[in-house]
């Protein structure tokens, strides 16, 4: 099946919340039958918090994203969860704009890398809503 996205070549202006932008990136890269919300409680790292060893490639995407946000937070005044940025969705890829090393660009690159990783990783239904106390130590 072919998934047609109206976002395909749209320039997305900065939004007030980074979560909206990250959600749009995810929606652009994942299979049509999935929703971005299905990635919000997956494995040990996709969603709030995170601990233990990632359980698969998709969970590793979230682990890397969490660490990337941790690095971004070291930039003076940078809050990755609320930092907006400029980007473009085009030809099945994502382009981040802005000066290298700035909070906005670093956060955009974190989200871009994670979204593309999601699109290239298998989604295993049994890894959604797992008991993290049991599986993520």
Curated annotation (Swiss-Prot):
Q: Which UniProt keywords apply?
A: Calcium, Disulfide bond, Hydrolase, Lipid degradation, Lipid metabolism, Metal-binding, Neurotoxin, Presynaptic neurotoxin, Secreted, Signal, Toxin
The pro-peptide lies at: 10-17
The cofactor note reads: Binds 1 Ca(2+) ion.
Q: What cofactor requirement does the entry state?
A: Ca(2+)
Tissue distribution of the protein: Expressed by the venom gland.
Per the record, the domain of life is Eukaryota
Which residues are Ca(2+)-binding? 45, 47, 49, 66
Any one GO CC term of the record: extracellular region
Catalytic activity, reaction form:
a 1,2-diacyl-sn-glycero-3-phosphocholine + H2O = a 1-acyl-sn-glycero-3-phosphocholine + a fatty acid + H(+)
GO MF terms, alphabetically ordered:
calcium ion binding; calcium-dependent phospholipase A2 activity; phospholipid binding; toxin activity
Q: Which CDD domains match?
A: PLA2c
Places the protein is found: Secreted
Q: Which residues form the active site?
A: 65, 111
Disulfide pairs here are 44-136, 46-62, 61-117, 68-110, 78-103, 96-108
E.C. code: 3.1.1.4
GO BP annotations of the record are: arachidonate secretion; lipid catabolic process; phospholipid metabolic process
* Quaternary structure (record): Heterodimer; disulfide-linked. The A chains have phospholipase A2 activity and the B chains show homology with the basic protease inhibitors.
Role played? Snake venom phospholipase A2 (PLA2) that inhibits neuromuscular transmission by blocking acetylcholine release from the nerve termini. PLA2 catalyzes the calcium-dependent hydrolysis of the 2-acyl groups in 3-sn-phosphoglycerides.
User: What family does the Swiss-Prot or TrEMBL record give for this protein?
Assistant: Belongs to the phospholipase A2 family. Group I subfamily. D49 sub-subfamily.
Q: What is this protein called?
A: Acidic phospholipase A2 beta-bungarotoxin A6 chain
Give the originating organism. Bungarus multicinctus
Ranked from the top, the taxonomy reads: Eukaryota, Metazoa, Chordata, Craniata, Vertebrata
């Amino acid at each position: 099946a072919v998934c047609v996205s109206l976002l395909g070549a749209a320039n997305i202006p900065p939004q007030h919340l980074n979560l909206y932008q990250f959600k749009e990136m995810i929606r652009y890269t994942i299979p049509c039958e999935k929703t971005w919300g299905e990635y919000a409680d997956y494995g040990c790292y996709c969603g709030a918090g995170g601990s233990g060893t990632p359980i698969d490639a998709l969970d590793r995407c979230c682990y890397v994203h969490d660490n990337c946000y941790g690095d971004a937070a070291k930039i003076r005044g940078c809050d990755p969860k609320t930092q907006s940025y400029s980007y473009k969705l085009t030809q099945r890829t994502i382009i981040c704009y802005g000066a290298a090393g700035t909070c906005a660009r670093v956060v955009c690159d974190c989200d871009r890398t994670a979204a593309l990783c999601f699109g290239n990783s298998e989604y295993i239904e049994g890894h959604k809503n797992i008991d993290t106390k049991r599986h993520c130590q």
